[in-house]
Amino acid sequence: IERAIVEHNVTLFLLCNPHNPVGRVWTEDELKCLGDICIKHNVIIVSDEIHADFVWDGHTHTVFANLGESYAEHCIVCTAPSKTFNIAGLQVSNVFIPNETLRKRFVKEIDKAGYSQLNTMGLVGCQGAYEVGGPWLDELKVYIQGNIQFTLDYFKQYLPKLRMYRPEGTYLMWFDCSQLPLTADEREQWLLYDAKLWLDSGSMFGKDGETFERINVACPRATLVEGL
């Protein structure tokens, strides 16, 4: 990472934690290592933590700004209630910028772009979701973990040629189709027109993802069973 930052004169690093699509939850040590590199080269880290509420047993989410003052001064943390509470339609998100100078620059730019005003419904919905949505979220997480385990068991029993990875976080599951005798395009055509499934092709995440597919298991179990 450091070599790439230097060679390409990087000034801003986009971090996804928990990671979409592979489901990694970066450890505190990993985040500090990245932070030290970025601080050394004066790189701002934009930490996309939109799936932070979906971190599974044995793993802990660390807010990048909470690593320490020096890390906080070099970061922008982005969250939203849309994934957690399924309210993307309210079009509201949260941007935390501890560095006052950087925050003023950000506010100036969104004012220029015409995005300085939140819609009232979005603001009320966001506040209400975080204030009273905890019990609902607790139940949801149990349900989604059940879907994750069901999917892992199903792939192991019925789809042994497809390697399914257990996510450390998010409700998105990532599986490898490299043992299938199909190109990425052939696989997409088969899934869409024969299986009648519209998954997310790994190709959209770059060349290294061409043999992969992503599936969203945050749905009713009956829907998941039908799709599988």
Regions found by a protein language model. Give the residues of each.
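Active-site phosphate-binding strand-loop segment of PLP-dependent enzymes
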Residues: 1-60
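A generic structural signal for well-ordered alpha-helical segments
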Residues: 5, 38, 68, 155, ...
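PLP-dependent enzyme catalytic core of the Aspartate aminotransferase-like
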Residues: 6, 71, 181, 190-199, ...
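Structural signature of PLP-dependent enzymes
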Residues: 104-111, 129-152, 183-184
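Conserved glycine-rich beta-strand-loop-beta hairpin in the small C-terminal domain of fold type I
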Residues: 120-123, 127, 142-152, 164-177, ...
